[in-house]
Amino acid sequence: MKKNILLIRTALKALILHKSRSLLTILGIVIGIASIIVVMAMTQGATNLIVSEIKGIGGESFEILPGKDPKGPSDFGNLFTESLKKRELDAITNKRNVPFIKEVSPNVLVPGSVSFENETFSPTTFGVGEVFIRLLDINIGKGNAFSSGDVRSKSQIVVIGTEVAENLFGNNNPIGKKITMKNRKFTVVGVIEKTGAKAFLNVDKLVLIPYSTAMTYLLNQDFYNSIWARADSPENVKTAIRDVEITLRDLHDIEEGEDDDFHIQSQEEALERISTITDVLSILLVSVAAISLLVGGIGIMNVMLVS
């Protein structure tokens, strides 16, 4: 017992005599532990944020994209193929092919800015179907959304987000006003409620127009950038996806063993990918932080051995 007390006193004296070395060693331990805690907290926070964004589109929804599923940078060029057109849309919406599908919205991206009188704003503009607002689960605060009739007649109308409305019209009511996009006039028929970020989109910066209008008057293209779909229930999502895959493979004459010229992303698949990425990232960052902790621990051992 006396021997242990003597050793402790000797060690304390050594630590006191070498204050700077002891302080730096303890600092290394503190930084190491703090780094691990911070890294784990940040990784978990980022994961929760991403998961909430993915879940924002609803468990019944999935997205059909052109090109094969990219596995690396060399595959991203396949995303710009023209494999999704009206015949694909008609085949997918045919209940005999995909009985469990409830709603479908073709989507096209429209680059460029919008303007009103002397004000100009750069939004995120999509040409979409009338069900897109329901698919994204957002609400109209003023005015109305466009209808299936507007899509069929290629109406030159828009629904805008609150940030777009504020930048172009200030405190004035935008309903009925005409904004300019690519030298064409579009009438504002609705303003989306202030929503913020959802499904990786800043809803407040959105401009939505009928996809038929966008493809005819703004883009001069006959293909879609993607097709959003919703199954009639979460239990039928996998069945609906399988039916879509079978339908498109048959339509495109893809033989067994050949790669698809399209790919489908569901909420479940996205969550699995995010989980894998964040797990690997977490292990990597925690390992780096643990090195600092190990170095500090070795320093403490050296001081104790010297003392």
Stretch-by-stretch model annotation:
Residues 1-31:
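N-terminal Sec/SRP start-transfer signal
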Residues 12, 23-30, 179, 284-290, ...:
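Hydrophobic residues within alpha-helical transmembrane segments
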Residues 18, 298-307:
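Interfacial "coupling" helices/loops that link adjacent transmembrane helices in transporter permeases
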Residues 20-48, 296:
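Short, strongly hydrophobic transmembrane alpha-helices
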Residues 30, 39, 226-230, 263:
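Short aromatic/hydrophobic contact patches that present stacked aromatics
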Residues 44-124, 167, 215-216, 239:
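Hydrophobic, regular-secondary-structure patches
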Residues 126, 130-146, 155-255:
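Mid-to-C-terminal secondary-structure elements
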Residues 228, 244, 255-289:
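Peri-transmembrane interface segments
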